[in-house]
């Protein structure tokens, strides 16, 4: 059974466990690089189970969602209260051919987008962090909440990649 938006929020925010979201986001690219540094592209394309994403697919997903996160923040900054469109990650994975993407290129794209997004976030006034958008599935989300969600999302996928990277061949 697919989780509800409320369950998703609770699970993703639960990953933070009191960690500062900007610090989590700043640390993620280096953690990803460390985890995949010694893995071959073919190893990164191996799915851990039917219906589960490979490391390569997760890296492509992270790159695309970083683009989404940056767009959401910029849209909210330019028009407080703006609608925020949801997206189906599985549709994006299939139609964006995540399984065929070069994992190293996905990681480089993620890193570049993350650096740009962090530079913007660090420049915001305290007041701007309260600007919000209306997410199509989750309702009102401030920039602060968007950043927390993306940091929790990072931690979720870091755990998945770490588990797959440690798994023996077979």
Model-predicted regions and their roles:
Residues 1-26:
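Extreme N-terminal tail/first-helix region
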Residues 2-11, 45-91, 115-119, 130-170:
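Short, contiguous alpha-helical
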Residues 11-18, 96-103, 139-143:
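A short, mixed-charge helix-start or loop-turn motif at secondary-structure junctions
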Residues 18-29, 52, 56-59, 103-107, ...:
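Amphipathic, non-membrane alpha-helical segments in soluble helical-bundle scaffolds
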Residues 23-35, 93-130, 150:
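Acidic/histidine-rich alpha-helical segments that form the ligand environment
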Residues 26-53:
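A glycine-rich, hydrophobic loop/mini-helix early in the fold
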Residues 35, 39-42, 80, 124-127, ...:
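A short secondary-structure junction motif
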């Amino acid at each position: 059974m697919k989780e509800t938006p409320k369950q998703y929020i609770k699970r993703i925010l639960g990953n933070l466990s009191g960690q500062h979201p900007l610090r989590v986001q700043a640390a993620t690219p280096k953690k990803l690089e460390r985890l995949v540094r010694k893995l071959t592209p073919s190893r990164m394309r191996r799915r851990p189970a039917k219906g589960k994403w490979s490391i390569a697919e997760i890296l492509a997903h992270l790159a695309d969602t970083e683009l989404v996160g940056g767009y959401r923040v910029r849209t909210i900054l330019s028009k407080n209260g703006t609608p925020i469109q949801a997206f189906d990650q599985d549709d994006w994975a299939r139609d964006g051919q995540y399984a065929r993407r070069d994992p190293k290129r996905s990681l480089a794209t993620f890193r570049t987008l993350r650096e740009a997004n962090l530079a913007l976030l660090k420049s915001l006034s305290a007041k701007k962090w309260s600007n919000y958008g209306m997410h199509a599935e989750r309702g009102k989300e401030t920039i602060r909440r968007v950043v927390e969600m993306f940091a929790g999302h990072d931690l979720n996928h870091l755990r998945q990649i770490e588990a797959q990277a440690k798994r023996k061949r077979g």
